Curated annotation (Swiss-Prot):
Residues 17-38, 56-67 have a biased composition (Polar residues). It comes from the Viruses. The keyword Transferase does not apply. Disulfide bonds: none annotated. Keywords: Coiled coil. This is Uncharacterized protein S2. Residues 1-67, 145-167 are annotated as: Disordered. Residues 74-121 form a coiled coil.
Length: 1312
């Protein structure tokens, strides 16, 4: 005591006038003792010893759990003495300022505390020392008129990493905790740390008079400290907290420009070359007329040879054509050899890439288009006269190039075409929706891509977020009974907000079930939202510790056993467990305990398990097999006779049937662990089954069994259903962990009363177990101090009994809010089972017991939860914080919560609603990506009657899962998604994911089953819809443009002729096969045709049957006879390599021709307008074609000399040209729109205007005519084989707000 007094004296000099300052005193550091201890060698020795102990304690803390128990105990003892000295000093200081009676009572009480602690014998028993150390009370602080901060009331010896709500959290220690949003100065708790206690500046009577305002600390709860097993590392189950999810933009907005995929190019005589000219407006026109007309006049000049349509996208954000050599297959090993993909693979890969790119950028909106009025300076043509409205920066069009054209016959021809398909640009039938004007009659340049612009407008028109719809959604994310009103003003008409259609919300459901990453994002959102409310608060159970020490029970092992079962946690810990309770289907729960079962620890651990079952019933049901095992072990310690009777009568385990009946009793006295799979199959420990005669053993066992078999009430999520939020059950039925008290007004009734009944039952169980243990003669450790500890412990718990109704009411309302919200998509609780039936969610292409490829089974996250309870979880509300009172050594003492008042804010229902909308929009984009993948699969699996069959049939076998992954990765990159998040990652089960199927459905499967299951009235078994009609249209548009042989983007063709042709005119459309030619099908076994080597002449004998049925034999190359024979063969690879040299020479000599009917290629037309220059030699190309293996895509240039004779340098004479390569089909061999405008006097015979299928013009919108269909053929324009230029386009003529918000006010229904 002398040492304590010396410390007290030294410390007293440092506090001086602190009691009058109105501020709580900080603990005096040990360094201050060096300057203040001036009492001689005794004080110096005391300081040195304390400093050494402090260093030793820091070393112990760093090692966390190392077996240096004696050092820990000695340090604890010394620190307790120091803190008691500080407390005595503070109390003495206060006595000088207070009346003598108060001073006397305070000093006596604190001296009594010091007496018990200073005289305590430190227990050095190894088993007891490994338990958590006991804390000294730090709640006796000043809290009258001064503001006490959280930092003052929660001192820790060493701060640990803080859990930032809006940052990232990565905790791996089992004693690291987060902190709530309003505890910015609150340090975290370490279980094995000692604490520095703040000196008390108030007497006990003053403490009892504290008024803390209208605050509600009416929560008594339990908490199961969880440890997530992640990659073998245990961590507290706090989700990684990140910033709010920011989805990618779905719609690209193009301002003041018209997007197009095709551009007009023209070739003019003046250039004297075949180079195509890009359209550029001439300066002379800019002063006279509109840019659009100037550009149109610029490329249709007086001496224009040809005007072509070239695939050249413009004004398309984020769209980049891929002309590089792409090979999705790369290098594929086939039958032990390496397959080097040929040009066909490269061509298909390029087309797939560009198709994917086009789909990803197909959601385009056009806005801010400036309208221009045409001002005619003189009489215009019949084409321009009715056109009154133009759009600035629109694309040129041939129709607009006829103004003042020098060739009158050309203007007349264009007018005749116009009269067949009349057009206007004025707004003739304008339909307005949210300032959206739809022009169905403009004649601006429109490609098929224009339809995608219209589809985006259709998407917004059909899925606009209205105020009423938004209010319904907000109501689902708010507390029941909240008043929700819109504060929007009259400007709401300018707002264009996208509301994701139903299938997008269903995709959100699928991603929640299938993607761990996505579901973690959603859970993280709810953790943050509830944390931001500031509703929950946590406090260490120091008050109870104070009571124990005031009773002198510091030597009691029961005390450390009790607090060994009470982990120290934060608000975030509790909120995270609360969220996990609502997503219990996501986890495989394994309850564990780090406490060795002893007589002292068995009772508090049993109570902690029962509280866990009560407050977290869904998680408990998920891991009930591990809880029951622990209960059986505890009961064997607490009531051995009762356990022996149970084992003799029922056995350790009971096998249940699927309907819950007893199938078999396992009569054995061995209490073994039940595996998870056996538990899911109905094997449980006997204590968990509602046995009829259990009350014959003891009423205690019946109470425990009743808590285990408690069932949750069923609720219907009406607000969720009204908001059309996704849910796996059609009836929107769920089970409420805390009942449904949204409409309840009377406190303590209904579920509140039932919950209170179980709280009292648990308290009664604790008393009964203690009595039973105390009466066992073999138990000698439970002395009078232990009895006092247990009695105070039960009394402490009982003090909060009156708070339970308010606690359950608050938990119920928050729980019902979560279940009605958009993220709660599945109910994991089963009221017919003790242990939740295990379900693995999957995606498959079928529903049978033996499904085809495509099954994806989700392996759940395993969560290890350490059972434990917290006896002081608070709700901030509107009533007084409770007071804990008790008879403490005949002294009346009340301990109040002196924490600072924390502001409570309502749940932000608007923010939660907006977050759900953002995720649903992202799911819409995710669905577009998945639909694209599905269409790629369809292309790869093309059937014989489909356009892509021919060039995909040989490649299909190479698209194995490994090579197909290249396509998936490309889609992920282009769409900025991750389709792999819903694909298989299981190495445990035999099923693997293969998404090379065209239709998928959601299924579930029991872990021990052999096939997927479906369920009526649920989402399980239904086909997954990844898209709507608009997405389907956009995919068809992109696929039609990119993939088939009729693609206008690539000018593809099938069939090529190798034959010498000599003439004045060479043109791809001219036939080179005449009637006098002998066409013979090439077959090696054909008796009417064969090649044979002739050794005598080193030549080849060629025998064939002519049209007169006469066999003819020709010796080549010696023979000069023109046999006029054309061989017809599928691909060059079908010809034996032995004869290819002979055939090649015969083609060049003009003696033989070859038709390759199946050869596919991309062509281009070279317009030769230099008559004096020979056309390029084609010998090398003939060789390349002939020696190819077939099935390869080649680029073939066709020569057109139609306009060579019109050049200015060639005026007389006759020139002939020689060509060897010609198309088999000449019908659609050109992409020209207009040809032959080189004579201003008379119309040349070469002049031609493309038909409607290539240069269709806009037409008047009439009733019954679909503006997206051709008026003549009636077929959809996007299905035509070549681009249509007159698709009507929708533009925003005002400036709408695409990313605005609806102002909503939410008023919660009174106090929670």
């Amino acid at each position: 005591m002398d040492k304590i007094n010396n410390s007290k004296t030294a410390q007293h000099d440092n506090v001086e006038s602190a009691p009058n300052s109105g501020q709580s005193l900080r603990p005096v550091s040990t360094d201050n003792f060096e300057s203040s201890a001036t009492d001689g060698r005794e004080g110096n020795r005391e300081h040195s010893r304390m400093k050494a102990n402090r260093i030793e304690m820091n070393s112990i803390n760093a090692q966390r759990g190392e077996t240096k128990n004696e050092a820990v105990s000695m340090t604890q003892y010394n620190n307790l003495q120091q803190q008691i000295a500080m407390l005595q000093m503070s109390l003495q200081s206060m006595m000088k300022e207070k009346n003598k009676q108060t001073e006397k009572e305070s000093e006596e009480q604190n001296n009594e505390i010091a007496k018990h602690i200073s005289n305590a014998d430190i227990n050095t028993d190894t088993e007891s020392l490994v338990k958590p150390q006991v804390y000294i009370p730090d709640k006796l602080q000043k809290a009258s008129t001064s503001q006490i901060t959280d930092a003052d009331s929660h001192h820790r010896s060493k701060p640990l990493p803080k859990a930032q709500i809006d940052g990232s959290l990565d905790l791996v220690s089992d004693n690291v905790q987060g902190k709530g949003p309003d505890h910015s100065t609150n340090e975290n708790t370490s279980v094995m740390k000692t604490i520095s206690m703040q000196p008390n500046t108030m007497t006990a009577s003053e403490i009892s008079e504290i008024s803390v305002g209208s605050m509600d600390n009416s929560v008594f709860s339990v908490y199961a400290q969880a440890v997530i097993s992640e990659r073998g590392v245990n961590a507290i189950p706090i989700l990684r907290l990140t910033d709010d999810y920011k989805p990618q933009n779905l719609v690209n907005v193009v301002a003041n420009a018209i997007p197009t995929l095709f551009t007009f190019h023209s070739i003019h005589e003046q250039k004297l070359t075949s180079k195509e000219l890009e359209i550029k407006p001439r300066e002379v026109y800019k002063e006279l007329t509109l840019d659009q007309i100037a550009q149109s006049m610029d490329f249709i000049k007086d001496r224009t040879i040809v005007v072509s349509v070239v695939f050249e996208p413009r004004n398309l954000p984020n769209f980049k054509m891929s002309d590089d050599d792409i090979n999705y297959l790369r290098q594929v090993v086939v039958l032990g050899s390496q397959y080097n993909a040929n040009t066909t693979v490269t061509e298909v890969s390029r087309r797939l890439r560009n198709m994917i790119m086009l789909i990803a950028n197909s959601f385009v909106l056009v806005k801010d288009i400036t309208k221009c009025v045409w001002k005619r300076k003189r009489q215009e043509t019949k084409i321009l006269t009715p056109m009154k409205t133009f759009f600035k920066n629109d694309n040129p069009h041939p129709m607009l190039g006829v103004r003042n054209h020098a060739a009158a016959w050309f203007t007349k021809a264009m007018i005749e075409q116009f009269e067949k398909y009349p057009i206007t640009i004025q707004e003739t039938e304008t339909e307005e929706t949210v300032l959206l004007k739809r022009f169905g009659n403009d004649c601006n340049n429109r490609s098929v891509y224009g339809a995608t612009v219209n589809n985006t407008v259709r998407l917004l028109k059909g899925n606009t977020l209205t105020v009423d719809r938004y209010l319904t959604m907000v109501r689902a994310n708010a507390f029941g009974g909240s008043a929700i009103v819109s504060q929007d003003q009259g400007d709401s008409g300018l707002r264009v907000l996208f509301y994701p259609p139903r299938h997008a919300w269903n995709i959100l459901l699928h991603r929640m079930l299938m993607s761990t990453t996505f579901s973690d994002t959603v859970m993280n959102h709810y953790v943050k939202m509830i944390s931001d409310m500031g509703l929950f608060t946590m406090q260490d159970p120091i008050s109870f510790m104070s009571l124990m020490y005031q009773q002198g029970n510091n030597r009691d092992n029961v005390l450390t056993s009790i607090f060994g079962a009470i982990p120290k946690v934060s608000e975030i810990d509790f909120i995270t467990m609360f969220i996990m309770e609502h997503f219990s289907w996501k986890y495989d729960v394994i309850f564990t305990s780090s406490i060795n079962i002893t007589v002292e620890s068995a009772i508090p651990e049993m109570l902690s398990i029962l509280y866990t079952m009560l407050f977290f019933p869904k998680l408990s049901q998920n891991g009930m097999h591990t809880l029951l095992y622990r209960v059986m072990l505890l009961l064997r310690i607490l009531d051995k006779n009762g356990m022996d009777q149970l084992l003799r009568q029922y056995g350790a385990q009971v096998q249940l049937t699927p309907n819950g009946q007893v199938a078999e009793l396992h009569i054995t006295e061995v209490i073994d662990v039940i595996s998870e799979q056996d538990a899911r199959n109905g094997l449980i420990h006997a204590i968990g089954y509602p046995l009829v005669c259990l009350d014959q053993i003891q009423e205690l066992w019946t109470s425990i069994n009743e808590i285990i078999n408690r069932r949750l009430p069923q609720v219907i999520l009406k607000r969720k259903q009204n908001a059309n939020y996704p849910y796996t059950r059609d009836d929107y039925v769920a089970y409420a962990s805390y009942g449904n008290m949204e409409g309840q007004t009377v406190v303590g009734t209904g579920f509140e009363g039932e919950f209170l009944k179980y709280i009292r039952m648990i308290q009664s169980i604790g008393k009964d177990m203690f009595t039973k243990v105390a009466n066992q003669s073999s138990v000698s450790v439970l002395n009078s101090m232990s009895r006092g500890t247990f009695n105070t412990f039960i009394m402490y718990l009982g003090n909060y009994e009156s708070s339970i109704p308010k606690v359950v009411r608050s938990l119920s309302k928050v729980s019902m809010l979560l279940m009605n919200s958009w993220g709660y998509v599945h109910e994991g609780y089963n009221d017919a089972c003790i242990v939740t039936p295990q379900r693995l969610f999957g995606i498959t292409s079928g529903t049978g017991r033996n499904p085809p490829i495509g099954l994806r089974l989700k392996v759940k996250n395993t969560v290890n939860i350490m059972t434990g309870m917290t006896v002081y979880i608070g709700l901030e509300g509107g009533t007084l914080r409770p007071t804990l009172s008790g008879n403490l050594l005949n002294a009346s003492l009340s301990i109040r919560d002196t924490r600072s008042i924390k502001t409570v804010v309502p749940f932000d229902a608007v923010k939660c609603t907006d977050h759900g909308l953002a995720l649903a929009k992202d799911c819409y984009r995710f669905g577009v990506a998945m639909s694209t993948l599905q269409y790629v699969i369809k292309i790869i699996n093309a059937r014989e009657n489909e356009e892509t069959y021919q060039y995909m049939k040989d490649l299909k076998s190479f698209f194995m899962m490994r090579t197909f992954a290249e396509v998936i990765d490309d889609i992920n990159t282009i769409f900025k998604v991750n389709l792999r998040e819903i694909m298989a990652n299981s190495v445990v089960l035999e099923y693997t994911s293969d998404f090379r199927v065209e239709s998928l459905r959601l299924v579930y499967q029991a872990r021990d089953d052999i096939g997927p299951e479906t369920e009526q009235g649920t989402a399980f078994g239904r086909l997954i819809n990844w898209k709507d009609d608009i997405v389907q249209d956009n995919i068809h548009i992109a696929a039609k443009l990119m993939m088939p042989d009729t693609s206008p983007a690539y000018l593809n063709q099938k069939g090529v002729i190798l034959k010498r042709y000599i003439g004045q005119l060479i043109k791809p459309s001219l036939p080179v096969i005449t009637n006098d030619m002998h066409i013979i099908d090439y077959q090696e076994s054909n008796m009417n045709f064969k090649f044979q080597s002739v050794s005598e002449t080193t030549g080849v004998s060629f025998t064939f049957r002519d049209k007169n049925n006469m066999l003819r034999t020709v010796l080549t190359p010696e023979s000069d006879e023109l046999i006029n024979v054309v061989l017809r063969v599928g691909n060059p690879g079908d010809i034996h390599v032995q004869w290819k040299q002979f055939i090649e020479q015969s083609i060049l000599d003009g003696k033989l021709g070859v038709i390759f009917t199946d050869q596919r290629y991309t062509y281009k037309i070279c317009y030769w307008n230099e008559a004096s220059v020979p056309i390029p030699d084609q010998n090398d190309l003939v060789n390349t074609l002939l020696y190819s293996e077939g099935g390869e895509y080649l680029t073939i240039p066709f020569i057109d000399t139609s306009y060579a004779k019109r050049t200015s340098i060639f005026t007389s004479g006759v020139h002939t040209y020689k060509s060897f390569i010609h198309p088999l089909e000449t019908t659609h061999i050109t992409g020209d729109v207009i040809t032959g405008i080189f004579n201003t006097v008379t119309k040349p015979h070469e002049f031609d205007i493309a038909g409607e299928d290539q240069l269709g013009y806009a037409y008047r919108s009439q009733s019954g005519i679909d503006p997206n269909r051709s008026p003549q053929s009636g077929i959809p324009k996007m299905m035509n084989s070549v681009p249509i230029m007159n698709n009507p386009i929708n533009v925003y003529t005002a400036v709408p707000v695409f990313d605005g918000e609806i102002n909503v006010l939410v008023q919660p229904p009174g106090m929670l």
